[in-house]
Structure formats: structure tokens, C-alpha cells
Amino acid sequence: MKRSLLPLLLTTLVAPAIGAEPPTAYDQGMAALTAKDGTTAVTAFQACLAATPSDDACRWQLGWAYWVQNDWQDVVSAWEPLAQRTPSYETIARDLPSARAQLATQTAAQAARASAPATFPPGRSVIRLRAVGDMMLGTLFPDGALAPDDAAGTFDAVRSTLLDADITFGNLEGPLCDNPAPSDKCKPDAAPGSCYAFRSPTRYGTLYKAAGFDVVSTANNHAGDFGDACRIETEHTLDAEGIHWSGQPGTVAEWTVNGEKIGLIGFHTNMACNYLNDTAGAVALVQQLVARDDIVIVSFHGGAEGSKAQHVPVGKELFYGEDRGDLRIFTHAVVDAGADLVLGHGPHVIRGMELYKGRLIEYSMGNFATYGRFNLSGAQGIGEILEVGLAADGAFVGGRIIGTRQEGQGRPVLDPQNQAADLVRALTASDFATNGAKIAQDGTISAAN
């Protein structure tokens, strides 16, 4: 039996009319998936299968319910009988191999955790930074993509953790702009959900400030979604909140913390930002900061995207034909030029980390607070708050991965399982056998390779 499937990104449901038949277990499961409530969805689809074991639609959606919860063994167990019976069912030929790959990564992560030290003692630092990946708290485009509480509670579960640092950094994925001008990125006849352009209201600037963000990157593929006017309005909004920023070509953030002059520059693989793909130009910009600042931080938005982009390849990355950078070349070049810390974001998944010449390189911190328009299933719902300790000379003296995950439509909460630490540990062992950072069971990071 095969039903038409509701898209997982559906955001509204039609309530049954008075006197209508009560929703079936399948309907209840789909409603739960729409709300990204994996636990309820699993219960509903299990009930559906218990009533009709041959119901392929229930089995298929049960796999997606497990997917939302990162229960990869259960995804594979749910789908393998379906694939054997109906190899062409929906997109199972594509998605079952992806689930198997995620299961292999999860199994490796669990094995690596078991063999890791319990903890690493922190070193003596003059600057303690906490950093997160992509943030977009809700968008005015399309209409109705704001949270019911107008994003007021976005950071409630993580605010105290973000505030507990000398510097707190994040990637601002899209402009803060009240200008109603249309986006050149989206065609007027584009189907709903087919074009991803973000524009958050300027009032959200106060939410970032209240959560403790001192500096953000505006160098990313959504910064220009609504043109130069919105980029400028974003910069003015951040300035008014006292939040430092770097994004457009030549822009850097510089300020003083604990008596140390800090310089930060954000790069992206688009020439409308400090340009990641121009290695010589990037080196020159970093050297300018090194000449006048005590500690220099580089952030970059680069790499392919999605659950298949967890590994850092050797060489250039392409995403839908776009050059998303040779990240190993770029990161090593900026450290050689004097950068003390390199923070990556953009793939929407966590990646491994490297210690290169005593400097930490985190290749992707994943999604952190991305409301409504983002796929948060599986690995894309796992994030981190990366703590980094830096000495007066910029050397890495220790750190910690504080795991997060997103609930519902995209609200960050602390993850007691710290799946992020386990993922980073396994991905690091796979991708950086020589220079990989060492991560203990509690998420602390050693200052030595």
C-alpha cells in the first residue's frame, strides 16, 4: 500500500472538522514528523505497523522518524526489509546507503569514545572564547517564517553557557533587515520552499546581544540575499548593539579584551566577501592584522553542504558546481601567515579539527540556531559550542566541545550525550591522522597532538 507523502518541511496542518474521523496512527506520525518530534512519530508509526505489518508507507516514515533522532541502526533496520521487497520505493535507493554511512560513522564515534582519555586538564589562558556555527532565528521571507514567540526564547537553554566566555562568536546566516525589497536570489514564480533566502528583522539584533555574542561573521552565502541595502542595514544594526563583525571585502573586527588586542576576519567563497579562494589575498589581509593585533582569529564559510559533507577532502570542494574552497590549503596558509585560531562553518554539519603549528583549526561547527527553513534531521541537527583557550602569544592551550542539538523547528539546547564531541573525535581520526586534535570523553581538547 502506497500513500502520497507529505513533505517533511510542511509547516502548517489542517485540523479535522468536527465529526470527522479521528486521525490514523499514520496521520499522527506525519504530524509529529512535521513538528520534528521524533519520539512521538516513532510511537505512531510503530502502532501503524503493528496494525498492518505490510504497510510500506508506515515502514518508510518510521525510518524517517528514527532519522530525526539519529538512531541510525533503527533506520537501517526499518528500511532494509522495504528495500529488499521494493528496491524502487520512493528514494530508498539513495537514502538507505546514506543511513548506513551514518551508522558507520556513529559506530566509529562510539568506539573512539571508549578508547579516549576521560579528560584533559586545561592550560593557562588569557582569552577564553566560545564559538558556534550557523545562526538564523527566523525570516520575514517568506511570510510566516518567524517563531510564534518572535524568537525571544531562542537562546534560553544555552544563554548562560554562551555568556560564560571572554569572547563569544557565531556566524550570522543572513541579513538583519526590515527593508521589504524583493530578493534577486528568488524568481517571482519560484515554488514555495524552492528558494532559500533569509531576512531576519533588525529587532533580533538585541537577542544576539543579550545571548552574549561579541562578534559575528557576515561572510557567507546568505549575507547578500536581499542586496547591498540589507547588508548595510545589518552592519548598522550590529554596530548599534555593540557587536563586532567582519564580512564585506576589507572589513575586519578589532577590539580589546583583557588587555589583548583582538583581530577577527571572516572569509567566504564569494567575492562579495573577504574572498577565501584568493589565498594570496587572504594571507595579505591576515598579515595586516598580525602587524597590529595580539591575537588574530580567522573564520571561514566554506565547503560542501549536508549530511554527506562531514569529511574534509583533500583538494577543492564543489557544491552544485560552485567552488567552495580548498580548505586545507586555505587554513594552513592563514596559520602560516600568523592566524592563531581558525573557525569554520557552512557545511551545516560538524567536521573534524586539526592542530597545525600549535594553532587549532575547527573545520565546521555545524548548525547552532537555525529556525524553520533548515533541514535539522540526523547529523544536521547536531551542533556545538566550541570553547578555546588562548595564551598571550595566541597559542592554543586547551579547549572543550560542549554538545548541542536543536529541538522543534530550530531551538538550541545542551546535549547531555555530547554527540558533537563523539562525532568530532571520529571525524578527526579519519581525516587528520597526523595533526588531529585529541578529544577526551568529556569533550575536553588537548593542547598537544
What is each PLM-predicted segment?
Residues 22-33, 60:
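Alpha-helical tetratricopeptide repeat
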Residues 104-449:
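Acidic, metal/ion-coordinating pockets
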Residues 34-35, 68, 98-106:
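Register position in tetratricopeptide repeats
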